Amino acid sequence: MNTSELSIAEEIDYEALPSHAPLHSQLLAGAFAGIMEHSLMFPIDALKTRVQAAGLNKAASTGMISQISKISTMEGSMALWKGVQSVILGAGPAHAVYFGTYEFCKARLISPEDMQTHQPMKTALSGTIATIAADALMNPFDTVKQRLQLDTNLRVWNVTKQIYQNEGFAAFYYSYPTTLAMNIPFAAFNFMIYESASKFFNPQNSYNPLIHCLCGGISGATCAALTTPLDCIKTVLQVRGSETVSIEIMKDANTFGRASRAILEVHGWKGFWRGLKPRIVANIPATAISWTAYECAKHFLMKN
């Protein structure tokens, strides 16, 4: 095998993380990416949750600057980190499943010879399957996280027990169908846009953290904007049982349809776009961090 053939083989091996790569490499890379993404961007995510949930109460402020100022003054600078334990506990395993499933499906759907060509539909399908598997694991942790983001006086175990005792086990999965409705297109577009941008900016498929970061940011901004209405519905379903929710129609919303009607009745069509700015602000670096961390871990693990 000559030098050029060897170089191409190495690029295919790196980019695809093929089936013969150790399973633990795929899982560790995914777990590392998930923990980095969710922990570093957690305060912005918490702000997004509060902006969306502000519509579940009477006379609540919804501006980003006013919310940050109010939270810092009344609750302290660490208030927006409340609940990070829950998301770290869930993000590691969930993202391990997410990226591991993605690589597995991608390796089965796309032959090694076709890895250098643009395969948006197969990439999107791989991301969709990965999302269904990962969200089944992550949804309970996400529900607990959002309750903690609204009520900073509680702890992870106390909230978990409170949800189970007062609302039953099903409460951890009320938002699962909506989460899938949001995350399936998010993941499909995420993988498709990221891979497409990578093919454009990095046609050699080489390890390049700056390019990975750029492509991840482009993907994150686009996907966040497209899925904000579904994220608003998901927030209603996940925090409806919280004591901080005061509007009765919001408290009774336990299905996708009821949550949608509640938002529409209380806020009109604009209600589906609450939290758009912090969601985009959060997802640009979050998705960039996730992809860069994943590619970094994948590169390191494949070389070692």
UniProtKB/Swiss-Prot annotation:
Solcar repeats lie at residues 21-108, 118-200, 207-300. The keyword Transport applies. SUPFAM superfamilies: Mitochondrial carrier. It is found in: Mitochondrion inner membrane. GO terms for cellular component: mitochondrial inner membrane; mitochondrial membrane; mitochondrion. Keywords: Membrane, Mitochondrion, Mitochondrion inner membrane, mRNA processing, Repeat, Transmembrane, Transmembrane helix, Transport. The keyword Metal-binding does not apply. One of its GO terms (biological process) is iron import into the mitochondrion. The chain crosses the membrane at residues 23-41, 83-102, 120-139, 175-194, 209-228, 275-288. One of its GO terms (molecular function) is iron ion transmembrane transporter activity. It is a multi-pass membrane protein. Its main location: mitochondrion. PROSITE patterns: SOLCAR (PS50920). Present with 1340 molecules/cell in log phase SD medium. Belongs to the mitochondrial carrier (TC 2.A.29) family. MRS4 suppresses a mitochondrial splice defect in the first intron of the COB gene. It may act as a carrier, exerting its suppressor activity via modulation of solute concentrations in the mitochondrion (possibly of cations). Not essential. This is Mitochondrial RNA-splicing protein MRS4. It comes from Saccharomyces cerevisiae (strain ATCC 204508 / S288c) (Baker's yeast). The gene is MRS4.
